[in-house]
Amino acid sequence: NKKISDMRAELKKRHNADWSKEMQRFTTKRNNKVDDYIQKATKMVIDFCKENNIDTLVCGYNTGWKQESDMGKRVNQKFVDIPHASIVWRLSYKCETAGILFKTPEESFTSGTSFLDGEEPIKENYDKSRRVHRGLFVTKKGEEINADVNGSYQIMKKAFPNAFADGIVGAGSHPIVVNIPL
């Protein structure tokens, strides 16, 4: 985006034009790289699911969430360019082909409610201040949990409300890191 913005400003100044063949080539090349990466990344996810007998994939989704982002001009330029909907669509398609159930629950209020405290991910329980640092969430009991792990469990709870009805020992306290080489 920054490169295109610079090219457009220069073109406007010199030739009073908005678009050029060079900008089109640059955009096409970038889009092809992004599509290639999405293809490879989603294939890795599906292959991982198959190898580990995972029959359901859950991916939280908020409609229009990038349009309301306010992270500053530069960060917004980079963030809005990430084709999240394309990734979700590609995962959905590949899951269907592989016989894997794909669910996309709405993910609002999952990052500010506590899984370990048994809170429902609803507006009444939402408290943004418990996310104390980037990547760290503190429960009402004072326990610390990785914020992404907490949010993921809450998204799973939205997709499958009875998933943790029998409890889960040490949930979120001992996450497993899975490295997938690119």
Which stretches of residues belong to each language-model region?
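Substrate-contacting helices/loops that form the catalytic groove of nucleic-acid
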Residues: N1-A85, A165-L182
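Positively charged, low-complexity nucleic-acid-binding target-recognition regions
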Residues: N76-L182
